[in-house]
């Protein structure tokens, strides 16, 4: 009988785990990594050339994207091999038929996801968003934050006027008063915060942001390189270890590489918990499935999806994931 997509995925990800600590028999000629401004581990790894050191015979190329949906479009089109996004872009991509696999994750960053209003806004509670224009990147983690926040306030998605804009355009619309609120993530959040002109209506705490970033690979790439992905993550975790040991150094790296003011990067780091990359767990799949169901119930994706079809729990890439012990003020 011909193997199903789920069977192939299970076999592949089991193979990734089995080869987690083995050396690649043949490294690829090129490795194309998609990243965003908020991807500290990838930015630090790029600066320190951790992947280039680990794979000396491979040309490593980093490609920046403004948000997760654009990154996954490129991944599905074959323009990149692996990338990191928030929790929602993979749901939209799977619903659209993209041939992708969840291969790794970072912990949730609830302090780095917010809904902003201007400091003089009459909007003081989530319930006040009713009838208002809210800007955000469609299919992003901010989309999920907004949806959960509305539900928590007893509102439906249809109670607001969504304005779908990428981060830079959303910032312009927000600053010009063309929208009433803005759902966004760091470092865009920190850049707005430091102007002193915004008020945080809510962040991702209290169950509004229960998933972290995900690393996804194009399935053909992962199938061609079954022993490569765990080694990539082990190299990227060198960047996380460096950040934990010397946060000031990583702040300087982000400032130089991304062209952001140091104060913005320092603010982002203050919202960022320890973020080691680990393999997908059953809890990750459960959380993603609940979120996917929520989006389908609100008619935001065209069909129901089964997250387990493109992800399965595996043996940890390195050490067990650290528990986020950040204290809520």
Language-model features: locations:
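Bacterial N-terminal signal peptides that target proteins for export
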Residues: 1-11
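Bacterial N-terminal signal peptides
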Residues: 9-20
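Boundary at the C-terminal end of the N-terminal hydrophobic targeting segment
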Residues: 20, 24-28
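Short, glycine-/small- and polar/acidic-enriched structural segments
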Residues: 27-153, 161-164, 180-184, 209
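Small-molecule pocket liners
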Residues: 41-42, 109-115, 198-199, 211-215, ...
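Pocket-lining segment of extracytoplasmic ligand-binding domains
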Residues: 88, 163, 168-256
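Secondary-structure end/capping motifs
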Residues: 223-300
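Conserved C-terminal helix/tail region of periplasmic/extracytoplasmic solute-binding proteins
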Residues: 293-329
């Amino acid at each position: 009988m011909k193997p199903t997509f789920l069977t192939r995925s299970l076999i592949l990800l089991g193979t990734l785990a089995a080869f987690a600590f083995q050396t690649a028999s043949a490294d690829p000629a090129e490795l194309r990594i998609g990243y965003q401004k908020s991807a500290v581990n990838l930015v630090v790894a790029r600066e320190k050339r951790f992947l280039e050191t680990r794979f000396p015979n491979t040309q490593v190329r980093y490609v920046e994207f403004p948000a997760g949906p654009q990154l996954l479009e490129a991944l599905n089109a074959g323009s990149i091999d692996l990338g990191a996004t928030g929790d929602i872009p993979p749901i939209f991509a799977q619903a659209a038929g993209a041939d992708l696999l969840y291969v790794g994750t970072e912990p949730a960053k609830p302090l780095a996801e917010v809904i902003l209003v201007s400091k003089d806004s009459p909007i003081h509670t989530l319930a006040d968003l009713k009838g208002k224009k809210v800007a955000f990147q469609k299919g992003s983690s901010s989309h999920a934050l907004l949806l959960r926040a509305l539900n928590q306030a007893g509102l439906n998605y249809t109670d607001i006027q969504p304005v779908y804009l990428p981060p830079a355009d959303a910032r312009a619309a927000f600053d010009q008063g063309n929208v009433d609120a803005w759902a966004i993530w760091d470092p865009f959040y920190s850049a707005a915060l430091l102007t002193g002109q915004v008020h945080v209506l809510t962040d991702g705490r209290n169950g509004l942001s229960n998933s972290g970033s995900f690393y996804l690979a194009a399935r053909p790439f992962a199938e061609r390189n079954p022993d490569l992905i765990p080694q990539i993550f082990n190299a990227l975790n060198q960047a996380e270890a460096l950040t934990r040991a010397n946060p000031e150094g990583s702040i300087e790296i982000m400032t130089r590489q991304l062209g952001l003011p140091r104060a913005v990067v320092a603010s982002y780091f203050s919202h960022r918990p320890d973020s080691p990359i680990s393999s997908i767990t059953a809890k990750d799949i459960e959380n993603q499935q609940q979120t996917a169901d929520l989006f389908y119930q609100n008619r935001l994706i065209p069909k129901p999806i089964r997250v387990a079809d493109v992800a399965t729990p595996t043996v940890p890439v390195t050490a067990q994931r650290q528990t986020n012990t950040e204290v809520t003020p």
